[in-house]
Amino acid sequence: MAQITTTDANEFSSSAEFIPMRGFSNCHLQTMLPRLFRRQVKFTPYWQRLELPDGDFVDLAWSEDPAQARHKPRLVVFHGLEGSLNSPYAHGLVEAAQKRGWLGVVMHFRGCSGEPNRMHRIYHSGETEDASWFLRWLQREFGHAPTAAVGYSLGGNMLACLLAKEGNDLPVDAAVIVSAPFMLEACSYHMEKGFSRVYQRYLLNLLKANAARKLAAYPGTLPINLAQLKSVRRIREFDDLITARIHGYADAIDYYRQCSAMTMLNRIAKPTLIIHAKDDPFMDHQVIPKPESLPPQVEYQLTEHGGHVGFIGGTLLHPQMWLESRIPDWLTTYLEAKSC
């Protein structure tokens, strides 16, 4: 597997250095270990269904009842492909936010909370409307409070697109983007090579299972039938037959090219931290932005190790989830200073 490399890596910030767990720096171990160390949600989530203007819904998993915590700084999490609160990175970060006295929430993309969504659409890497609507609803419903958004993988690319599209109008004070596939087409091809095919097969099975549940619950809400769905063998094929078609793109390549955040990064106006690992097995080297393409309010951190949304440090007996400290530490300036 080829590592992500760039001749410009030294020009980026590398504050808060990530040191991988001794003996476990391998990218695949880093990618898979979080599921061993973060198996269960350690807090009792407060669930809320948010009805959307088009008749669909998204489910919210809060760290506590938001009506009783409207004064607290807010941390919003956007998960990755087929992720949810149960994803180790999601509930781990919400728990970390809770420990700091912040209000944390995971906004599940349509159909990702365990119940199929109703409408003739799903979610994708460039679908920013739901996130935008939710962030504005959050402010209307609970009033003004310092707010940060964090996006992982697919959710990270989506968040980058949202930040670029809305600039200073987006009601967040800062953002963090982790392991985002900023060049969707290149990453799609990368997932079809070498050991990365194992991850593609895993994710594709999740996508197909979710789509099958949607077809069973709401027949006709996807542009293919169950027999066609079963024959899909690659994520690119899934995107070609379903994601692109249902959202008005010509095909998967058209979807990838229109929704890749790379060309939009220079339009991000809010303070933003972007984190990638050089050895991310999901990524192609093309996800690395050129230093001159980033505005001064965007900090880029490229680590030697970490895998895909892994970043496990410490020891086997005392593992340290680096993102659960790095992200809140970086956001403190924007969340706690404004709440004083």
Predicted regions and their residues:
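Conserved alpha/beta-hydrolase
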Residues: 86, 94-118
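Catalytic nucleophile-loop/oxyanion-hole region of alpha/beta-hydrolase
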Residues: 110-148
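The serine-hydrolase catalytic nucleophile loop
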Residues: 83-95, 285-287
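N-terminal cap/lid segment of alpha/beta-hydrolase-fold proteins
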Residues: 24-70, 312-318
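Catalytic active-site module of serine/aspartate enzymes centered on a nucleophile-bearing elbow/loop
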Residues: 304-340
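Short beta-strand/loop motif that positions the catalytic acidic residue
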Residues: 268, 274-276, 280
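Alpha/beta-hydrolase-fold enzymes
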Residues: 4-10, 140-246
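Short beta-strand element of the alpha/beta-hydrolase
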Residues: 71-80
